[in-house]
Amino acid sequence: MESTIVMMMMITRSFFCFLGFLCLLCSSVHGLLSPKGVNFEVQALMDIKASLHDPHGVLDNWDRDAVDPCSWTMVTCSSENFVIGLGTPSQNLSGTLSPSITNLTNLRIVLLQNNNIKGKIPAEIGRLTRLETLDLSDNFFHGEIPFSVGYLQSLQYLRLNNNSLSGVFPLSLSNMTQLAFLDLSYNNLSGPVPRFAAKTFSIVGNPLICPTGTEPDCNGTTLIPMSMNLNQTGVPLYAGGSRNHKMAIAVGSSVGTVSLIFIAVGLFLWWRQRHNQNTFFDVKDGNHHEEVSLGNLRRFGFRELQIATNNFSSKNLLGKGGYGNVYKGILGDSTVVAVKRLKDGGALGGEIQFQTEVEMISLAVHRNLLRLYGFCITQTEKLLVYPYMSNGSVASRMKAKPVLDWSIRKRIAIGAARGLVYLHEQCDPKIIHRDVKAANILLDDYCEAVVGDFGLAKLLDHQDSHVTTAVRGTVGHIAPEYLSTGQSSEKTDVFGFGILLLELVTGQRAFEFGKAANQKGVMLDWVKKIHQEKKLELLVDKELLKKKSYDEIELDEMVRVALLCTQYLPGHRPKMSEVVRMLEGDGLAEKWEASQRSDSVSKCSNRINELMSSSDRYSDLTDDSSLLVQAMELSGPR
């Protein structure tokens, strides 16, 4: 009798689950059907716009009466004219995210990071089965992470960090086999942590989580291994009779025994971590040993990197820089990486100090920053391991064929600027790059800018506005105050970024700007003179000039931003967040007008000439040469 009742209950539940599936299917089909004259992608996008507050009007050209949304800003379409990308990062948008986003059934990329969007993440988001990238970080989303996120089986990149999300980690996240990167850091999540399939993940900044799931005050679902399958009802399945009852008891006993074994192993690992003086803990993964910290920063063995790079063969050399050489490597699991072998590895401080600094750097995670994949440390060697960027650096691509078109150059400028904004204004503690140049801006598979080589940048103390140290950088990119006093600040990077913009405009290295036109004297004065005389055709890349494939207004705006960034006095230069807005067309006119009223640039031009543009002083240096000068000791404030 009892088994019959259980069976009836299961049949009833299965029936309702089937009805729910039919409802979901019908709603999905309804999203694909459209009455005559109605484009449901347009309808969905207009619903999204209606739920958002857009102070800068970036969505103004979204028109409800339009037939095709593919020409709208922030919208990307496929060759078949389906909307596959929605990207409105760092636009100061507020409001909520409309559930209508799920009617954009072909979406592959959603980038809404660095806004002020609040409310709950729509539970319907699990219907976007083609979604590959979802970035909702740095907003004000609250509530639980929808369980349906686990249905996104095509998702490879998921960032929900820096929100106000709460509740337990959905177990469905452990089933996302395609997920390569996951960041849930700095929320209010609680309970045990599932075993993520993502190779790289971060969960720091969630004080209520239970690392092992065995803590006595841990609330939520028990941590389970990925290989264990549970029935959807959560109750044992009886086929009837005492025999099945006994079988259930046996299975229950077995599960209980396995659970005790996992608890014992967890306690052992916890004990070993507590007794390990190292700040990292050992885990096994496949056929090799590695060490990881919270967030899955991996520690490599030196032998492993030797094998990966063919003993650091010159054939694998990708580039040389001020901090060391970079080699292409292939790991045992066929992952392609870039290995930076630091100069003077044995003299970069102790092991604990180095690991602590590396762990802090690894927390700087942003779409436009080169993610630190891992590190290696021995008594004589220190190495950093990064993802391999197949498109190389901006500097190398500027010299390659086909040349970068104007739209890509502008996208590179905005992307690099956003990466620097994160380092300066959102990273804690803040990071100064100190060597911003085209060679340190890498390009991912989609030609998006990724700022690299900030791995050993000095960290800003919260109580200091500058750092005094050895002057490191590339001639032509070094701000005058940094070169003369050794004081670096965020405005030092702003200066270097201004030079980077001119590199993008001219297609030349910093010291080549005036040589083509046989110009002598101060390079920035020459650029300013050309701009005043409205002869920007003398400045623009010859390859772009031949094809006339650039926007004259946008070119003029980029040169203006470059000149604002390279003003002599650091206090007159804009912040990087202001630079981003100006590159996007917001506030440039006001900033430019204010700079023209100031005569500080003209008063200091002679000083710039002395510090930066003496051809005799730097005759033996190229753009790839790194200048290392011991900074003068400062006796006190100046």
UniProtKB/Swiss-Prot annotation:
Please list every transmembrane segment annotated in the UniProt record, as residue ranges.
Answer: 249-269
Catalytic activity, reaction form: L-seryl-[protein] + ATP = O-phospho-L-seryl-[protein] + ADP + H(+); L-threonyl-[protein] + ATP = O-phospho-L-threonyl-[protein] + ADP + H(+)
Q: Which residues carry this modification: Phosphotyrosine?
A: 482
The residue intervals holding the LRR repeats read 104-128, 130-152, 153-175, 177-200
User: One of this protein's Pfam families, by short name?
Assistant: LRR_14
Which terms are listed as keywords in the entry? ATP-binding, Cell membrane, Glycoprotein, Host-virus interaction, Kinase, Leucine-rich repeat, Membrane, Nucleotide-binding, Phosphoprotein, Plant defense, Receptor, Repeat, Serine/threonine-protein kinase, Signal, Transferase, Transmembrane, Transmembrane helix
Where does the entry say this protein is expressed, by tissue?
Answer: Expressed in seedlings, leaves, roots, stems and flowers.
The active site consists of 435 (proton acceptor)
**Regulation acting on activity, per entry:** Inhibited by the viral nuclear shuttle protein (NSP) that binds to the region required for oligomerization.
Q: Which GO terms describe its biological process?
A: defense response to virus; negative regulation of multicellular organism growth; protein autophosphorylation; protein localization to nucleus; protein phosphorylation
Cell membrane keyword on record: yes
Q: Which InterPro entries match?
A: Kinase-like_dom_sf (IPR011009), LRR_dom_sf (IPR032675), LRR_N_plant-typ (IPR013210), LRR_R13L4/SHOC2-like (IPR055414), Prot_kinase_dom (IPR000719), Protein_kinase_ATP_BS (IPR017441), Ser-Thr/Tyr_kinase_cat_dom (IPR001245), Ser/Thr_kinase_AS (IPR008271)
Major localization listed first in the record, in broad terms: membrane
Protein kinase domain: residues covered: 312-593
Null mutant phenotype reads:
Enhanced susceptibility to geminivirus infection.
Q: Identify the GO cellular component terms for this protein.
A: cytoplasm; nucleoplasm; plasma membrane
* Region of interest (Interaction with geminivirus NSP protein), residue spans: 422-502
Q: Where in the cell is it found?
A: Cell membrane
User: Which E.C. number(s) belong to this protein?
Assistant: 2.7.11.1
> Which residues are glycosylated according to the annotation?
92, 103, 162, 175, 188, 219, 231
Residues modified to Phosphothreonine: 309, 335, 468-469, 474, 485, 566
Q: Which family does it belong to?
A: Belongs to the protein kinase superfamily. Ser/Thr protein kinase family.
Free-text function comment from the UniProt entry: Involved in defense response to geminivirus and begomovirus infection via regulation of the nuclear trafficking of RPL10A. Phosphorylates RPL10A in vitro. Activation of NIK1 down-regulates cytosolic translation.
Can you state the subunit structure given in the record? Oligomer. Interacts with geminivirus nuclear shuttle protein (NSP). Interacts with RPL10A and RPL18B.
This protein's name = Protein NSP-INTERACTING KINASE 1
Task: Name the source organism.
Answer: Arabidopsis thaliana
* Gene label: NIK1
